[in-house]
Amino acid sequence: MDNKKKDKDKSDDRMARPSGRSGHSTRGTGSSSSGVLMVGPNFRVGKKIGCGNFGELRLGKNLYTNEYVAIKLEPMKSRAPQLHLEYRFYKQLGSGDGIPQVYYFGPCGKYNAMVLELLGPSLEDLFDLCDRTFSLKTVLMIAIQLISRMEYVHSKNLIYRDVKPENFLIGRPGNKAQQVIHIIDFGLAKEYIDPETKKHIPYREHKSLTGTARYMSINTHLGKEQSRRDDLEALGHMFMYFLRGSLPWQGLKADTLKERYQKIGDTKRATPIEVLCENFPEEMATYLRYVRRLDFFEKPDYDYLRKLFTDLFDRKGYMFDYEYDWIGKQLPTPVGAVQQDPALSSNREAHQHRDKIQQSKNQSADHRAAWDSQQANPHHLRAHLAADRHGGSVQVVSSTNGELNTDDPTAGRSNAPITAPTEVEVMDETKCCCFFKRRKRKTIQRHK
């Protein structure tokens, strides 16, 4: 099998967005007299399109508007309930470009349910579709957007702590935001500004590993408390993953998961930035050097980082036209495959984004203005609660409930702790959370 695919053990399905009335309801819903499962007054529950430790993801439909939505169902008796926390974080984020809309949260029979906007494929799915390499133009269009996306999250006093390609989705094909890169899954997010004191959280060590090992920062491997710098470093690792097709620390074997994560961290530290970014524009190395030198408390200069890539983009003569590498390819969706027509890219959106780029270029490199908090729109509900819910220096905290994805072929995620020596060969550093079922690959078979 092709080497590019060797280290890719992923499973799980997922993601979401809906339409209709927004709300947080305590009114119980469930099966109607016709036997149709309903969430709230107007969302009909359909087929299963994803699963994980949180429960299930279902395709839904707003019966008032006939628009498709995604519905996350979590058993009320869940050992580690987290759906209400995710809802609260979405509310805290409010309205912003590339932030999924949440339309409803409340009980549904024996489940808690959250209705979200239905989105398109994840960057990991699109990476597969493009033979596991993105062009420089596509990576730069992604990077420019995701720096802004992370700046917005940070402006809401949250750090994300879960960077991975599966957590960044394009809009649903045919939607006006179809080419916008969205950020999803705030199950590992945390408030870095104490809501009581309004001060930055203190620097601490001996913390549990939180996030996805393939992309997490070097300081996270060292057990240091995460802050804004770590989100940006993880993004840098993901950008190089897209350009290279793989990272030097993928596919490492060990007798235990703890040893494997130690090896990943050791290899990251031992890989010079110049080697990691060899044969690619110097701006990629400059980005990583900058974010790795940030102080724990320091506010990153997002404008400087964006300008690095927008200037490179201009020098290459690229147009920010949303002509990604996957344009023209057939995109899978939970409601049928869709041909991605280049003509669907909105000229108006392209002009708007170019205007934003020009605006960014005109700002000085040392400008450190925060994202305008006035963008929040009260009718867009999103949310999650900031809480460092997972302890233990040997635990790698993964999406939604702090457990590891060991490429479970049935549920997509596993409850195995990091200390468990079983299935090391099929353990993946990533946690899949795209909105539709992905083809499962077993690392054991690939490494034979």
Curated annotation (Swiss-Prot):
Q: Which molecular function term from Gene Ontology is one that the record holds?
A: protein serine kinase activity
The record's region (Disordered) falls at 1-35, 342-375, 392-417
Which regions are flagged for Low complexity bias?
19-35
State whether keyword Transmembrane helix applies: no
Tissue spec. comment: Expressed in testis, brain, heart, kidney, lung, liver and muscle.
Which of this chain's residues are annotated to bind ATP?
I49, G50, C51, G52, N53, F54, G55, E56, L57, K72
Q: What does this protein do?
A: Serine/threonine-protein kinase. Casein kinases are operationally defined by their preferential utilization of acidic proteins such as caseins as substrates. It can phosphorylate a large number of proteins. Participates in Wnt signaling. Regulates fast synaptic transmission mediated by glutamate.
- Taken from the record, one Pfam family name reads Pkinase
CDD domains registered for this protein in UniProt: STKc_CK1_gamma
Subunit structure, as described in the record:
Monomer.
Entry-annotated residues carrying Phosphoserine: S414
Something else the entry says is: Triazolodiamine 1 is a commercial name for 5-amino-3-([4-(aminosulfonyl)phenyl]amino)-N-(2,6-difluorophenyl)-1H-1,2,4-triazole-1-carbothioamide.
Q: By what name is this protein known? A: Casein kinase I isoform gamma-3
Record bears the keyword Cytoplasm: yes
Q: Which InterPro entries does this entry report, sorted A to Z?
A: Casein_kinase-1_gamma_C, CK1_Ser-Thr_kinase, Kinase-like_dom_sf, Prot_kinase_dom, Protein_kinase_ATP_BS, Ser/Thr_kinase_AS
Q: Which family does it belong to?
A: Belongs to the protein kinase superfamily. CK1 Ser/Thr protein kinase family. Casein kinase I subfamily.
Composition-biased stretches, type Basic and acidic residues, lie in: 1-16, 348-370
- According to its UniProt record, where is this protein located? Cytoplasm
Report the EC number(s), separated by commas if there are several. 2.7.11.1
UniProt KW keywords: Acetylation, ATP-binding, Cytoplasm, Kinase, Nucleotide-binding, Phosphoprotein, Serine/threonine-protein kinase, Transferase, Wnt signaling pathway
